[in-house]
Amino acid sequence: MRVLHVCSELFPLLKTGGLADVAGALPGAQIAAGMDVRVILPAFPDLKKGIANLQVVRELDTFAGHVTLLFGHFNGVGIYLIDVPELYERAGSPYHDPALYAYADNYLRFALLGWMGCEMACGLDHYWRPDIVHAHDWHAGLTCAYLAARNRPAKSIFTVHNLAYQGLFDARHMPDLHLPREFFQVYGLEFYGQISYLKAGLYYADHITTVSPTYAHEITLPAYGYGMEGLLKSREEEGRLSGILNGVDEMIWNPAHDPLLASHYSRDTLANKAENKRRLQTAMGLKVDDKVPVFAIVSRLTSQKGLDIALSAIPDLLEQGGQVVVLGAGDADLQEGFLAAAAEYHGQVGVQIGYHEAFSHRIIGGADVIMVPSRFEPCGLTQLYGLKYGTLPLVRRTGGLADTVSDCSLENLADGLASGFVFNDCSVGSLSRAIRRVFVLWSRPTLWRYVQRQAMAMDFGWQVAAQAYGALYQRLYTH
């Protein structure tokens, strides 16, 4: 079966969020499972630079300008790049300028991505034509609309990585997209008078997936649906909405051979983790003490991630004897709040503003607890890294967090299921009660080590997701 992924980022060449991790790992896992998989993306500078031996497949004139379709390989996966320098040859973020203003022509840049995804299904490359076109997030949402307009030459799947980003554009651009005029309506891609590339994917795809089963249900509810819940509820009732968990790339995230860790360890050599903790405490200016639990936050610093309540819970956490390390950037008030906490609680709180992939490995390899108190979380990768590294996740019961972390309740401990700490309400009180439970387990080192081993035994490898997507593709292809 031939599968084409349509997306805008690819780890490690270009990443602004978790979408890149999926695009960088899922196709390879699918190829290993026996599928014929390729990826198509805009030819952003970092992608053109990072993919060697690019060959010209086709040159063509389109509604968005002259296109050169390039093809090469990266990590064993075939990659198509849509080369239109006037649209994509811009340094920095693929979505906005250095002043953080979205590019005014984004409507055209990502319409072309969708159109090219559709054209691939219509035979643009004479030597390779997909049976399934798998589009990701709003950037690729129009792919499904173009396929519908062309009488569906391939089956389409649209994966929502985060429903909050909707790809909204002024209705006056509709004629520029070369789609049927009747597509601009409520039963189409119109959303409160605007064009929504996200809604185009949701409405016209043969099947919608999200990145966890719980999030797939949550987005059918007003609290999480961002105005799309009615459409999503109907897709759920039609059996056309499902959740498949993201995976962890075990070539990159594995404490047994992570080159970024000072000391390697596994389930059977957990004592070796202590050296990583000592180095982390030293690097973050904390008192070196293996008797106190280190709580880590590695995240965008936003209220969506629940970090306002995490900040408020710090005094109580420190009073019980813990330490806190923070790595991330985001909202100015949260950045200032965490920096103020580091200044006030010198030696107990360490904060680094910014994001460094290498340092995130050292934090997760050295900390005892990873905090992910999100208000909503489509899947979440940080807690999966924590599980893999025996750094117990402390999470709110939402989205992928609910699907991947089992609370250290007495029942779960007895049944061998416990892997972390889960709280329900997005409040300081609820988080603080969960923190107290962390300290109770911490006071029993043998039990703590038992839960660490449980967590590290869980399998969230990409091969699991690859098999789930393969079964979905097969079901769509044969119906």
Curated annotation (Swiss-Prot):
Reaction catalyzed: [(1->4)-alpha-D-glucosyl](n) + ADP-alpha-D-glucose = [(1->4)-alpha-D-glucosyl](n+1) + ADP + H(+)
A single GO molecular function term of this UniProt record: alpha-1,4-glucan glucosyltransferase (UDP-glucose donor) activity
Pathway the protein contributes to: Glycan biosynthesis; glycogen biosynthesis
Coiled-coil ranges (or none): none
Enzyme class, broadest EC rank: transferase
Any single biological process term in GO: glycogen biosynthetic process
EC numbers, comma separated: 2.4.1.21
InterPro entries cross-referenced by the UniProt entry: Glyco_trans_1, GS/SS, Starch_synth_cat_dom
Keyword Transferase: yes
Residues that bind ADP-alpha-D-glucose: 15
A single cellular component GO annotation: cytosol
Keyword set, alphabetical order: Glycogen biosynthesis, Glycosyltransferase, Transferase
This protein's record includes keyword Transport: no
Family: Belongs to the glycosyltransferase 1 family. Bacterial/plant glycogen synthase subfamily.
PANTHER family for this protein: ALPHA AMYLASE DOMAIN-CONTAINING PROTEIN, GRANULE-BOUND STARCH SYNTHASE 1, CHLOROPLASTIC/AMYLOPLASTIC
Function description: Synthesizes alpha-1,4-glucan chains using ADP-glucose.
Protein name (record): Glycogen synthase
Native species: Pectobacterium carotovorum subsp. carotovorum (strain PC1)
Organismal lineage: Bacteria, Pseudomonadati, Pseudomonadota, Gammaproteobacteria, Enterobacterales
Gene: glgA
